[in-house]
Regions:
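Alpha-helical scaffolding segments of alpha/beta enzyme cores, especially the outer helices
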Residues: 50-53, 77-84, 88, 109-120, ...
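N-terminal pre-domain/capping segments
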Residues: 1-125, 156, 194
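Histidine-acidic metal/acid-base catalytic patches
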Residues: 2-59, 182-196, 200, 207-282
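A short helix->loop->beta-strand "cap" motif at the edges of active sites that frequently abuts
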Residues: 89-91, 123, 170, 266-273
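Acidic-and-aromatic substrate-binding clefts and catalytic sites of carbohydrate-active enzymes
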Residues: 65-78, 99-109, 134-136, 176-183, ...
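Active-site groove signature of glycoside hydrolases
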Residues: 118-147, 167-182
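Short, surface-exposed connector motifs at secondary-structure boundaries
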Residues: 61-64, 163-172, 194-199
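Conserved beta-strand positions in the central sheet of alpha/beta enzyme cores
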Residues: 64, 94, 127, 228, ...
Length: 282
């Protein structure tokens, strides 16, 4: 990458954390616990109040939370209490929802539900995973008819909710959540063509779609309103190919170069970097 401009080099972001980082403690979203039609989750050993305390202790400014962290309690009283507690801690909140999560249905919500919940907790941003299904083989399925049909419906559903998005003034981010190629996220954002609607780039998820990390970040950066900043070790052994979590900077993602790309290319709407670590660590 060419040398950064001084403006880009001096650019600062708030430091946030995705609650999925603590999913083994019951926060965020549990992953892969379906058996005989039942869904299982890690026991919750930390609640949102304690998470806010830890965030302040660690110098975080933003928490990126899910409906699991709200205990699926969306009563006005509870959401107002969450909003006030975040204010008390000096924290901004972002809300993370899915349409049809394959792993943990507790995180699912409609656009309408997510906007109301996000507004009620004072969220600055609502991030959506669209859960678009692609046919196999995945590697050459970008913008395929099966995916485009689903994406067109998603665009129409967001368009119906633009008056509410404008009313509440929250930023909206569409993620490459192991279900969308970067070009597909960009297509959705460009179809919506609204200043409050952008992309969320996860720095690991592109690997699931057989898409290069650098290429994905390069493409998505100009649209990014949200970033899940991850680093994994990627390796092969006799048991197959693996992508395992690690401390940021210890893996195979060049996080320094990615940060340079974001500082140079991302719009002003990207004001926070949300750290996310896969557990258990490699």
């Amino acid at each position: 990458m060419k040398k950064m401009t001084k403006k880009a080099a001096d650019r600062k972001f708030k430091l946030g954390m995705h609650s999925y980082t603590l999913h083994l403690s019951g926060l965020g979203e549990s992953w892969g616990f379906q058996s005989e039609g039942k869904t299982y989750a890690f026991e919750k050993v930390i609640d949102l109040d304690k998470f806010m305390d830890l965030a302040v202790e660690e110098g975080l400014e933003v928490l990126h939370i899910t409906l699991v962290d709200l205990d699926k309690d969306t009563s006005p009283e509870h959401l107002e209490a969450v909003k006030e507690n975040a204010k008390k801690h000096g924290l901004d909140l972002e809300l993370n929802v899915s349409f049809n999560a394959p792993s943990d249905p507790r995180v699912n919500a409609t656009i309408e539900e997510a906007l109301e919940i996000g507004h009620s907790i004072g969220a600055t941003l609502v991030k959506f995973s669209t859960d678009v299904e692609h046919p196999h083989p995945i590697s050459h399925s970008c913008m395929c008819p099966e995916a485009m049909t689903q994406m067109a419906e998603i665009v129409n559903n967001f368009k119906k909710n633009i008056p509410t998005i404008e009313k509440y003034g929250m930023k909206i981010a569409i993620e490459n959540h192991c279900d969308l190629f970067s070009d597909e996220v960009i297509w959705i954002v460009e179809q919506l063509n609204h200043p409050l609607i952008g992309a969320c780039c996860d720095t690991i998820n592109s690997l699931v779609m057989s898409e290069g990390v650098k290429e994905c970040v390069d493409k998505m950066a100009p649209y990014c309103y949200c970033v899940h900043f991850c680093d994994n070790r990627v390796f092969a052994d006799p048991d197959g190919t693996h992508s395992l979590g690690c401390a940021i900077g210890d893996g195979d993602i060049d996080v320094v170069e990615i940060m340079k790309i974001l500082r140079e290319k991302a719009p002003e709407e990207l004001d926070t970097i949300d750290l996310e670590i896969e557990l258990p660590l490699s």
